[in-house]
Amino acid sequence: MKNSILKYFPNITDTQISQFELMGKLYPEWNEKINVISRKDIDNLYINHILHSLSIAKFLTPIDNTTFLDMGTGGGFPGIPLATMFPNCQFHLIELHT
């Protein structure tokens, strides 16, 4: 995981690395309980979900305290990875289905 994210985002902090690594532990655990993402895709969490969510971060430089709204967040993508990438911004994740 660490290398796949650092390949595209070499300047992320140790805290962010730890948070992304924690996602790799929490998502499979919770996916067993509530099917957060497709069970077939859980082995590709970093490539298909986390890095995919972060793709916009290569082109986005938000000002601190910018507020983002992730409508239809589903399993928390792209909101959770982007909130990790931009910790000085506010993210609101909304999902209609529970």
Residue ranges and their predicted role:
Residues 1-63:
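Class I SAM-dependent transferase core
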Residues 54-98:
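Conserved SAM/SAH cofactor-binding pocket of Class I
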